[in-house]
């Protein structure tokens, strides 16, 4: 999980003013008791939800990159995440499952989860987030292969538009050894196990 330090940003005051204006434009009284601190709360929330822009996922992996001869699949599954859809700025959330096959180097397991957190803490589309996670691991560790599967519920589909509350979107991307159907199948079987 990303650290929960207090958000201090030069953008905070501007964001507060813009959110105050939005509340007024929606027809509400931004000065009434229940809404007085809402612009600041929302501004801080948005800065937290997008703090991935200020973090380097490659550096996170490099900070715990270890030489190791292990050459079988490493899977970190059921990584919970929240993100914001870049089209409506509504949340989407779910689980990421990430595997790689080392090629002389491994990384700390928590670093895989941190990479997911960094890319999910940006305005995103699920497809690009899946690709970014895969590319970051491939570029930094140079493994024999990487596979990422992301399953998510999108509030932009549940609260508005088609209003399909039970829909789940699944995306996947892979490189190297995962181009082989047998390797992909092994990964899929392993992430389905509970």
Swiss-Prot record:
HAMAP family: FolE (MF_00223). The gene is folE. Pfam families: GTP_cyclohydroI. One of its GO terms (biological process) is tetrahydrobiopterin biosynthetic process. Zn(2+) binds at residues 85, 88, 156. It comes from Bacteroides fragilis (strain ATCC 25285 / DSM 2151 / CCUG 4856 / JCM 11019 / LMG 10263 / NCTC 9343 / Onslow / VPI 2553 / EN-2). The lineage of its organism: Bacteria, Pseudomonadati, Bacteroidota, Bacteroidia, Bacteroidales. Its EC number is 3.5.4.16. One of its GO terms (cellular component) is cytoplasm. InterPro entries: GTP-CH-I_C/QueF, GTP-CH-I_N, GTP_CycHdrlase_I, GTP_CycHdrlase_I_CS, GTP_CycHdrlase_I_dom. Toroid-shaped homodecamer, composed of two pentamers of five dimers. It catalyses: GTP + H2O = 7,8-dihydroneopterin 3'-triphosphate + formate + H(+). One of its GO terms (molecular function) is zinc ion binding. PROSITE patterns: GTP_CYCLOHYDROL_1_1, GTP_CYCLOHYDROL_1_2. It comes from the Bacteria. This is GTP cyclohydrolase 1. Keywords: GTP-binding, Hydrolase, Metal-binding, Nucleotide-binding, One-carbon metabolism, Zinc. Belongs to the GTP cyclohydrolase I family. Pathway: Cofactor biosynthesis; 7,8-dihydroneopterin triphosphate biosynthesis; 7,8-dihydroneopterin triphosphate from GTP: step 1/1.
């Amino acid at each position: 999980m990303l650290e929960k330090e207090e958000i201090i940003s030069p953008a905070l005051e501007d964001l507060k003013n813009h959110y105050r204006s939005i509340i007024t434009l929606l027809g509400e009284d931004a000065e009434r008791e229940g809404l007085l601190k809402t612009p600041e709360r929302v501004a801080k929330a948005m800065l937290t939800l997008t703090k991935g822009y200020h973090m380097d996922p490659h550096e996170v992996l490099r900070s715990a990159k270890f030489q190791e001869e292990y050459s079988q699949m490493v899977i970190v599954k059921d990584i919970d995440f929240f993100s914001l859809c870049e089209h409506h700025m509504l949340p989407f959330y779910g689980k990421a499952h990430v595997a790689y096959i080392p090629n002389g180097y491994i990384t700390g397991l928590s670093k895989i989860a941190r990479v997911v957190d960094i890319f999910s803490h940006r305005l995103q589309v699920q497809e690009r987030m899946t690709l970014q996670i895969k590319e970051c691991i491939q570029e930094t560790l140079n493994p024999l292969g990487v596979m990422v599967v992301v399953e998510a519920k999108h509030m932009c589909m549940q609260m508005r538009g088609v209003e399909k509350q039970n829909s789940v979107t699944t995306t996947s991307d892979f490189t190297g050894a995962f181009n082989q159907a047998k390797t992909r199948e092994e990964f899929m079987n392993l992430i389905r196990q509970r």
